[in-house]
From Swiss-Prot:
<dbReference type="GO" id="GO:0000149">
    <property type="term" value="F:SNARE binding"/>
</dbReference>
<dbReference type="InterPro" id="IPR000008">
    <property type="entry name" value="C2_dom"/>
</dbReference>
<dbReference type="InterPro" id="IPR035892">
    <property type="entry name" value="C2_domain_sf"/>
</dbReference>
<dbReference type="GO" id="GO:0030154">
    <property type="term" value="P:cell differentiation"/>
</dbReference>
<feature type="region of interest" description="Disordered">
    <location>
        <begin position="60"/>
        <end position="112"/>
    </location>
</feature>
<protein>
    <recommendedName>
        <fullName>Synaptotagmin-17</fullName>
    </recommendedName>
</protein>
<feature type="domain" description="C2 2">
    <location>
        <begin position="321"/>
        <end position="455"/>
    </location>
</feature>
<comment type="similarity">
    <text>Belongs to the synaptotagmin family.</text>
</comment>
<dbReference type="Pfam" id="PF00168">
    <property type="entry name" value="C2"/>
</dbReference>
<feature type="modified residue" description="Phosphoserine">
    <location>
        <position position="119"/>
    </location>
</feature>
<dbReference type="GO" id="GO:0005509">
    <property type="term" value="F:calcium ion binding"/>
</dbReference>
<dbReference type="InterPro" id="IPR014705">
    <property type="entry name" value="Syt17_C2B"/>
</dbReference>
<feature type="modified residue" description="Phosphoserine">
    <location>
        <position position="118"/>
    </location>
</feature>
<dbReference type="GO" id="GO:0070382">
    <property type="term" value="C:exocytic vesicle"/>
</dbReference>
<keyword id="KW-0597">Phosphoprotein</keyword>
<dbReference type="InterPro" id="IPR047897">
    <property type="entry name" value="Synaptotagmin-15/17_C2A"/>
</dbReference>
<dbReference type="GO" id="GO:0030276">
    <property type="term" value="F:clathrin binding"/>
</dbReference>
Amino acid sequence: MAYIQLEPLNEGFLSRISDLLLCRWTCRHCCQKCYESSCCQSSEDEVEILGPFPAQTPPWLMASRSSDKDGDSVHTASEVPLTPRTNSPDGRRSSSDTSKSTYSLTRRISSLESRRPSSPLIDIKPIEFGVLSAKKEPIQPSVLRRTYTPDDYFRKFEPHLYSLDPNSDDVDSLTDEEILSKYQLGMLHFSTQYDLLHNHLTVRVIEARDLPPPISHDGSRQDMAHSNPYVKICLLPDQKNSKQTGVKRKTQKPVFEERYTFEIPFLEAQRRTLLLTVVDFDKFSRHCVIGKVSVPLCEVDLVKGGHWWKALIPSSQNEVELGELLLSLNYLPSAGRLNVDVIRAKQLLQTDVSQGSDPFVKIQLVHGLKLVKTKKTSFLRGTIDPFYNESFSFKVPQEELENASLVFTVFGHNMKSSNDFIGRIVIGQYSSGPSESNHWRRMLNTHRTAVEQWHSLRSRAECDRVSPASLEVT
């Protein structure tokens, strides 16, 4: 409730003037509240006059209230009539005035929040929001075309794929001693160290011990008592940029002591897996994989480095790769010339135990099933990653291009006997694989433009089986 208090003064004429001004100022606010109450149809019991009890309601307030209730007119604060006080004949106030009475006007607005007065001139109607011409339709669930059963979801489930073989052990859960006793493939000693200053990883292959006796798949191996081991190093998943140690002749306890560096950022090195594969070299037979060791580099403190003895485990790769060859092909229709660039090779199969390899490439043009021309590169001594950058040109008319084939054969130069075969590919009409066919097709679609591509070398038997052109060359 709001309280408005009137306190008249009893100081003669000045007090009467002050009292009048105070009443006028108070009545402005009082009448404003009365106006708001009258608009809301307030009842009589909402206005109470409190003062020193007993007290009578002033006549001017009674007149204002009765005029508001009748609705004859609405008075502002300045239009409210003031009833003068009745004085005694001697000019003094009555006993009720001289008692310094305090009049308080109490105004209670009980429903101000719930009932807001509307303007007498503007009638604001509530705005209704809605979507015009909206149709209400009942939503019906869609009917399934067929009834599904749990068997429909699990009909492709094959339980035999998830059955456990009690005889197979998880290699990761076995210790090195358990792996060694189970597979008996020997152990490998190596170390790693990362150089933060130069951003490269150094892998040191130290030695191996207790390697198993050699295995001959075709019966052509002469020495079945000793192995000729070497180690291939790569950072998975990249197996192309691998390193290879030298071959140690006739020993089951080879000592390598060789270091290899991989240029790789530190964060990238932590995502790689170091793979070391021990291979048995045989000049007259294919090279056999003895075993492997894999180390996730995220589990190793590369900066601090460390040494490990790890037991070799069997590898799913029984044969080593023969190497890769980078070639460029370009055909000039106006001149009828087929240009071939032998750029480089990498990770070629080693053909000499002591000196590595002296590789060279022989290029032979076959038209249909007839050998037409033979050319070859120079040989590079003691390397398995040769750089050639040699160009060759063959006369091939445009009408004969579709029937042409190029046979690329990598040999290891041998002055004492016949050259050692390393690998072969065929590009052209009788390509030896999808990669070779794709290279030839790209060259035919882009004349006068050199097209480069890496190719993985294949064995002689594989090329002879899929390409008739391979049978026409030596």
